[in-house]
Amino acid sequence: MEKLREELLQANVGTVKENERMASHTTIKIGGPADLFVEPKHIDGLKKTMEIVRKYNVPWRAIGRGSNLLVRDGGIEGVVIKLGEGLDDLYIHDTEVTVGGGYSLIKLATVISKQGLSGLEFAGGIPGTVGGAVYMNAGAHGSDMSRIVKKAQILFEDGTIEWLTNEEMEFSYRTSVLQKKRKGICIAATLEMKKGNHDEIVAAMQKNKDYRRETQPWNYPCAGSIFRNPLPQYAGQLIEQAGLKGYTIGGAKISEQHANFIVNAGGATANDVLELIDYVKKTIYDLYGVSLQTEVEIVGRK
């Protein structure tokens, strides 16, 4: 790992750190150290990082702003690549928006709404990056990324870069081809918007932001929705009906605002959260015969 670190530093790919605690890079503020943590300063730095990582044949994963992510207390083996500055270009041409994978999704929704472009109102208040949103087909309020992504530019682990069409991305509920078949990083996406009334678009997005703030926990760190909705039922409703709001294990607590959120109420470990997830799963299955599936991505050494 030391030789890998030295080569990354010599290549001047960006920031390179050893044993970086992932708690500093996840929205739930939990997570052990990554063996190596790389934050490329530009697309060439990202491509070079992937090339070097491939050469040493070590495991890797990409993150954005760390939402929808729970890192185990043992940390992450190999290399964590964080997308952000330097991968956040934005081009708007008529109703077509091409944006870097490191661009903030909330910021993008705000910018294009002010341009009178409709289609991303659902993202008002959703944390994370565009790349992460494409990766997991993020959505809310009856819509998701699959409805607006025209194509996505993917850097695959073999070093090739391809534009995949919406169909090739194989979007489904909170997932895409990048989770199912082909490991890669969404470095850019072209979104197809619609022209609309500026005031109506801004109002709709603000309404969604306000709704999230009123119904979801903002006063404690959290990862976002913990469970996928077992449609037509909703995970949060089942958990609330089971009387589990406020249930706590260690520093992990089921939010009293929205039962499908687990918050870090203070000093929580990943193990606290995982124990709470297991307890909720067992309770809901015993009461209702429903097997809840996690939406939050759980990674790291067991």
Swiss-Prot record:
Species in which this protein is naturally found: Anoxybacillus flavithermus (strain DSM 21510 / WK1)
Broadest EC class assigned to this enzyme: oxidoreductase
Protein name, as recorded: UDP-N-acetylenolpyruvoylglucosamine reductase
Localization per Swiss-Prot or TrEMBL: Cytoplasm
GO CC terms, sorted: cytosol
Cross-referenced Gene3D superfamilies: 3.30.465.10, UDP-N-acetylenolpyruvoylglucosamine reductase, C-terminal domain, Uridine Diphospho-n-acetylenolpyruvylglucosamine Reductase, domain 2
Record carries keyword rRNA processing: no
GO terms assigned for molecular function: FAD binding; UDP-N-acetylmuramate dehydrogenase activity
Keyword field: Cell cycle, Cell division, Cell shape, Cell wall biogenesis/degradation, Cytoplasm, FAD, Flavoprotein, NADP, Oxidoreductase, Peptidoglycan synthesis
Disulfide bonds: none
Primary gene name: murB
Function: Cell wall formation.
Main location: cytoplasm
Cofactor(s) needed by this chain: FAD
A single BP term in Gene Ontology: peptidoglycan biosynthetic process
